Amino acid sequence: MGRIGDFFYHLTITILVAAALVFLLMAFKEQYPILKNQQELEDLQSNVETKKTNDNPHINWKKLKRINQDIIAWIKVPGTKIDYPILQGKEWNKYLHKNYEGDYSYAGSIFIQPGATFDDSHLIIYGHNMRVKYMFGSLHDFESENFYKKHNKIYLYQPGKTIKCT
């Protein structure tokens, strides 16, 4: 190769390396907050659940309420990563991009609308559908009939009450 060929070869390599670094930085920037939020939720789970059974876990509601008064319930879907507190703020989208402590979080929290109760005939539980199966991302597993047959229960826990949906 001549001088011009060497120049374009080195320029191409430099551009490719720079593009790869930008790609990796963007991937990290997108994934880190999600993974951080998930780690915080796992820490919360280990701090408030003292006994782990599906039908009747012992959840330390006093500890949860000290963390955030807006935590009103807990949802668990065995066989999935769905095992989260449910929050209810005064504005319907308060927890769309806030974690259970009220701090900004790209992934947000699982929440219901203000004024909604678990006694309503219809209740929408909101949460993000994350590609890495966090939050409600693992609901896609239920597209498989075999998976659904093996994991056909949803548990909603409230202080003194367990709702088992089948």
Which sequence ranges carry the predicted segments?
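N-terminal Sec-pathway targeting helices
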Residues: 1-17
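Solvent-exposed, non-transmembrane regions of membrane-associated and secreted proteins
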Residues: 17-166
